[in-house]
């Protein structure tokens, strides 16, 4: 007679590798912050001497502003993730600082799309005169981009209004009410969609630009063509930085969001998605170091031209 009984082993609580989340990632953000502040400071000082006489310049200046504001949120994340700040700082990061980070990241992404559209018109269809190429139109469009991103993001601040249950283990989603969790999920889908739409536009527009430059180069070797090629080479470097920095994060973002808002994910899956999201988000943050290099290079060419 078999008297043995089987019992399921108790579920192990989810644990995080504190070496990764509290030491390595904060340290890397420190490096990105210091480098970004220096490079954006130099870039801003150089670039804002360039008159806002072209749509392209206006869009680049907005990217400089967005990168600078995004960089200002890094110290809060470093102190929060490393456990050096009080629990109130963690709440501030979840409610405010992280939202500001994402607003400025997607503002930058939107302006990358507008830059590609502007370059397409200037290089591929130079004889077409359109209102979209006017400076005033570009300024209005810039304001609309900022307003749209704020309208999508600010509810994440307002709806993150629940009291803290455990100051030793504060979870972002626990601070949101029911509507806040739904808005968080929906707004993330919208933001990710914005990225992939911009990515598609960049691909289409720059393929057309490459074809135009190649055909022009075959027909003529005049200086104007050389100038166009040099200008476009600078833009391609910006696009390369865009893809390298932002694409990995937006591949990882949707699975991570689903793991936050849906209950059927295992502990191991949640942790894997968390680490993937954090490292790819760090890569996106590193864009604040790459943009100033490309932008300053372009500004110096404008001064010489």
UniProtKB/Swiss-Prot annotation:
<feature type="topological domain" description="Extracellular">
    <location>
        <begin position="161"/>
        <end position="188"/>
    </location>
</feature>
<feature type="transmembrane region" description="Helical; Name=5">
    <location>
        <begin position="189"/>
        <end position="209"/>
    </location>
</feature>
<feature type="topological domain" description="Cytoplasmic">
    <location>
        <begin position="51"/>
        <end position="55"/>
    </location>
</feature>
<keyword id="KW-0472">Membrane</keyword>
<comment type="similarity">
    <text>Belongs to the G-protein coupled receptor 1 family.</text>
</comment>
<feature type="topological domain" description="Extracellular">
    <location>
        <begin position="256"/>
        <end position="278"/>
    </location>
</feature>
<keyword id="KW-0675">Receptor</keyword>
<keyword id="KW-0807">Transducer</keyword>
<feature type="topological domain" description="Cytoplasmic">
    <location>
        <begin position="210"/>
        <end position="234"/>
    </location>
</feature>
<feature type="transmembrane region" description="Helical; Name=4">
    <location>
        <begin position="140"/>
        <end position="160"/>
    </location>
</feature>
<keyword id="KW-0297">G-protein coupled receptor</keyword>
<keyword id="KW-0812">Transmembrane</keyword>
<dbReference type="InterPro" id="IPR005466">
    <property type="entry name" value="P2Y14_rcpt"/>
</dbReference>
<feature type="topological domain" description="Cytoplasmic">
    <location>
        <begin position="300"/>
        <end position="305"/>
    </location>
</feature>
<keyword id="KW-1133">Transmembrane helix</keyword>
<comment type="function">
    <text>Receptor for UDP-glucose coupled to G-proteins.</text>
</comment>
<dbReference type="InterPro" id="IPR017452">
    <property type="entry name" value="GPCR_Rhodpsn_7TM"/>
</dbReference>
<feature type="glycosylation site" description="N-linked (GlcNAc...) asparagine">
    <location>
        <position position="161"/>
    </location>
</feature>
<protein>
    <recommendedName>
        <fullName>P2Y purinoceptor 14</fullName>
    </recommendedName>
</protein>
<feature type="transmembrane region" description="Helical; Name=3">
    <location>
        <begin position="97"/>
        <end position="117"/>
    </location>
</feature>
<feature type="topological domain" description="Cytoplasmic">
    <location>
        <begin position="118"/>
        <end position="139"/>
    </location>
</feature>
<dbReference type="InterPro" id="IPR000276">
    <property type="entry name" value="GPCR_Rhodpsn"/>
</dbReference>
<feature type="transmembrane region" description="Helical; Name=2">
    <location>
        <begin position="56"/>
        <end position="76"/>
    </location>
</feature>
<dbReference type="Pfam" id="PF00001">
    <property type="entry name" value="7tm_1"/>
</dbReference>
<feature type="glycosylation site" description="N-linked (GlcNAc...) asparagine">
    <location>
        <position position="3"/>
    </location>
</feature>
<dbReference type="GO" id="GO:0006955">
    <property type="term" value="P:immune response"/>
</dbReference>
<feature type="transmembrane region" description="Helical; Name=1">
    <location>
        <begin position="30"/>
        <end position="50"/>
    </location>
</feature>
<feature type="topological domain" description="Extracellular">
    <location>
        <begin position="77"/>
        <end position="96"/>
    </location>
</feature>
<dbReference type="GO" id="GO:0005886">
    <property type="term" value="C:plasma membrane"/>
</dbReference>
<dbReference type="GO" id="GO:0045028">
    <property type="term" value="F:G protein-coupled purinergic nucleotide receptor activity"/>
</dbReference>
<keyword id="KW-0325">Glycoprotein</keyword>
<dbReference type="GO" id="GO:0061484">
    <property type="term" value="P:hematopoietic stem cell homeostasis"/>
</dbReference>
<feature type="transmembrane region" description="Helical; Name=7">
    <location>
        <begin position="279"/>
        <end position="299"/>
    </location>
</feature>
<feature type="topological domain" description="Extracellular">
    <location>
        <begin position="1"/>
        <end position="29"/>
    </location>
</feature>
<dbReference type="GO" id="GO:0007186">
    <property type="term" value="P:G protein-coupled receptor signaling pathway"/>
</dbReference>
<feature type="transmembrane region" description="Helical; Name=6">
    <location>
        <begin position="235"/>
        <end position="255"/>
    </location>
</feature>
<keyword id="KW-1003">Cell membrane</keyword>
């Amino acid at each position: 007679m078999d008297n043995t009984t089987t019992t399921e082993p108790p579920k192990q609580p989810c644990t995080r590798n504190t070496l990764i989340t509290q030491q390595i990632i904060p340290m890397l953000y420190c490096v990105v912050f210091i480098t970004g502040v220096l490079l954006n400071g130099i870039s801003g000082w150089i670039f804002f001497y360039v008159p806002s006489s072209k749509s392209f310049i206006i869009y680049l200046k907005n990217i400089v502003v967005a990168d600078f504001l995004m960089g200002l949120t890094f110290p809060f994340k470093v102190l929060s993730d490393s456990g050096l700040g009080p629990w109130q700082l963690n709440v501030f990061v979840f409610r405010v600082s992280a939202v500001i980070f994402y607003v400025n990241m997607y503002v930058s992404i939107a302006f990358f799309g507008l830059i590609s559209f502007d370059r397409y018109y200037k290089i591929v269809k130079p004889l077409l005169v359109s209102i979209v190429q006017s400076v005033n139109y570009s300024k209005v469009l810039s304001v609309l981009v900022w307003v749209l991103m704020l309208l999508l993001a600010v509810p994440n601040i307002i709806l993150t209004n629940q009291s803290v249950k455990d100051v030793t283990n504060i979870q972002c989603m626990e601070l949101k009410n029911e509507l806040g969790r739904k808005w968080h999920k929906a707004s993330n889908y919208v933001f990710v969609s914005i990225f992939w739409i911009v990515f598609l536009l960049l691909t289409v527009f720059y393929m057309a630009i490459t074809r135009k430059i190649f055909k022009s180069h075959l027909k003529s070797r005049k200086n104007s063509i050389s100038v166009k090629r040099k200008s476009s080479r600078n833009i391609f470097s910006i696009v390369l930085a865009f893809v390298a920095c932002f694409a990995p994060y937006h591949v990882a973002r949707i699975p991570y969001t689903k793991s936050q808002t849906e209950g059927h994910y295992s502990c191991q899956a949640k942790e894997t998605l968390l680490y993937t999201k954090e490292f790819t988000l760090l890569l996106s943050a590193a864009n604040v170091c790459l943009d100033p290099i490309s932008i300053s290079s372009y500004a110096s060419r404008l001064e010489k031209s």
